[in-house]
Design a protein with these regions (language model features):
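N-terminal phosphate-binding or glycine-rich loops at protein starts, especially the Walker A/P-loop
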Residues: 1-45
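Short, ordered loop/turn segments at secondary-structure junctions
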Residues: 4-6, 34-39, 69-70, 106-109, ...
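Accessory alpha-helical/coil subdomains and C-terminal extensions
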Residues: 92-94, 100-105, 111-115, 122, ...
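Short acidic, glycine/serine/threonine-rich loops at helix termini
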Residues: 11-14, 42-47, 76-77, 112-117, ...
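A glycine- and small-aliphatic-rich helix-loop capping segment at beta-alpha/alpha-beta transitions
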Residues: 16-25, 48-53, 115-125, 141-145, ...
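Glycine-rich oxoanion-binding loops at beta->alpha junctions
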Residues: 43-101, 141-148, 152
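Short glycine-rich or small-residue beta-strand-to-loop segments that form or flank ligand, phosphate
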Residues: 1-8, 64-66, 99-103, 168-171
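Acidic/polar active-site rim loop that often engages polyanionic ligands
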Residues: 126-139, 162-163, 187-188
Length: 213
């Protein structure tokens, strides 16, 4: 099992569910946790996991396995050090005699996971991203927490905006989609919500701002 890409809330909770679920089904199950994303799989950097490792971390943010955004390209060409990363991951998989890889991540993570699947490895992925932009699921874990935090930030800024009669522009994360922006904007009572999916006219925005002065 590994976590890859950006960290977010619920990673530990999701891994806890996987580990405790497997341990409850079989007494002889062996679970390996690869450290810092795909790097752990490439360089065989792992540790054995048990249900005890996940006790008391249900509400803890981040990931106890560590994660990485290492910008390597998974091509069938060795890197400058002569390492074929695809073959290295396959070697680790077969050396440990794994039955399946459980991978938690977003779009980039899933692309790599799909490549490994095409190479013949058994892969199960869990949809993790605050952006909520993964196909095949209504809501990814990490999204609701991001909306809650963004909404709380908007609520706090309201007091300063009112006290100083100022206009605030708040930018939130979301990659190329506006799910967090839309939900947090509505919940926080934003006067204008700009989404990457919808073209907008700057003159119309100016008109709304002028109307509030």
């Amino acid at each position: 099992m590994l976590t890859s890409g950006g960290d977010c809330q619920a990673l530990n909770a999701a891994m806890r569910g996987v580990v405790k679920g497997l341990c409850s089904k079989r007494d002889d199950v062996e679970i390996y946790g690869f450290k810092d994303g795909y790097k752990g799989l490439i360089y065989a950097d792992f540790s054995m996991l048990t249900s005890k490792d996940f006790s008391g971390i249900l509400t803890r943010g981040g990931t106890i396995l560590g994660t990485s955004r290492q910008p390597f390209k998974l091509m069938r060409v060795p890197d400058k050090d002569g390492l074929d990363k695809v073959e290295a991951m396959k070697h680790t998989y077969h050396k440990l005699n794994l039955n399946c890889l459980v991978i938690l991540g977003g779009n980039g993570t899933h692309k790599t996971a799909n490549l490994l699947r095409e190479e013949g490895l058994n892969v199960v992925t869990l949809p993790k991203t605050i952006d909520n932009d993964l196909w095949g699921t209504d809501m990814t874990f990490g999204f609701q927490s991001a909306v809650d935090i963004a909404t709380d930030t908007i609520d706090r800024i309201h007091t300063t905006a009112t006290s100083h009669s100022r206009v605030f522009i708040i930018e939130v994360m979301g990659h190329k989609v506006g799910h967090v922006t839309l939900h947090a904007g509505i919940a926080g009572g934003a006067d204008i919500i700009l989404l990457p999916e919808i073209p907008y006219d700057i003159k119309a925005i100016t008109k709304v701002i002028d109307g509030r002065t």
